[in-house]
Regions:
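Kelch-like beta-propeller repeat domains
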Residues: 1-206
């Protein structure tokens, strides 16, 4: 069983947290504001991934009340226009949600997720300029199948943390170079096992 959520097709933005986000100066937070779309929106879905590359937001997968998806939606942050019918090559990942995606150079990397029947640990990448998907060999030492994990890129490595496989909750941390090489599990135990969390990098810390 994966977590449930209400569906909403809204996007909200905040200009920043504070003038100096690295220092808690005690100042007021900037308010969130709904984003107005200048075109037809894609509709509601839960547990997709979202990354930013250039001036666009790329949203992959998710589900909308039982239908698991593997489409790629692009929202131009300058024009506020959705691109919903991109002609992609390479096939791409199978429909899923609760996966993780990161950006490194001209690629988006997608790992794992849940497809309504099983948890996954496959690995795919998407080239932004060529609009092409390709699968990446998982290799030895890869994380076990999971969903609800998080990922970031630091110093040329994709770091994957946590998640669950329906029975077990994880607090392991894996690193893999991008471009991909064999994954390696780190020795650090960071937090209690967790899923559906968030992860970000601030300088050299997660």
């Amino acid at each position: 069983m994966e977590p449930t959520a209400d569906h909403d097709d809204n996007i909200a933005q905040s200009p920043s947290t504070r003038a100096n986000a690295a220092a808690d100066d005690g100042g007021p937070l900037h308010p969130w504001m709904p984003v107005t779309f200048a075109s037809r929106s894609p509709g509601s879905r839960v547990f997709p991934s979202a990354v930013v590359h250039g001036d666009s937001l790329y949203i992959f997968g998710g589900h909308d009340g039982g239908v698991y998806r593997n489409d790629l939606l692009v929202f131009n942050l300058e024009t506020r226009v959705w691109l919903l019918d991109l002609e992609l090559t390479g096939g791409g990942p199978s429909p899923r949600d609760a996966h993780a995606a990161v950006v490194h150079d001209e690629w988006m990397y997608v790992f794992g997720g849940y497809d309504s029947k099983r948890y996954l640990n496959d690995f795919h990448r998407f080239h932004f300029d060529d609009l092409a998907w390709s699968s990446v060999p998982v290799g030895g030492g890869a994380p076990s199948p999971r969903g609800g994990h998080t990922a970031v890129v630091h110093a040329g490595e994709m770091l994957v943390f946590g998640g669950c496989d329906g029975w077990n909750y994880f607090n392991d941390l894996y690193a893999r170079a991008a471009p991909p090489t064999q994954a390696a599990r780190t020795a650090a135990i960071l937090f209690s096992p967790t899923l559906s969390h968030s992860l970000s990098q601030v300088q050299v810390q997660l």
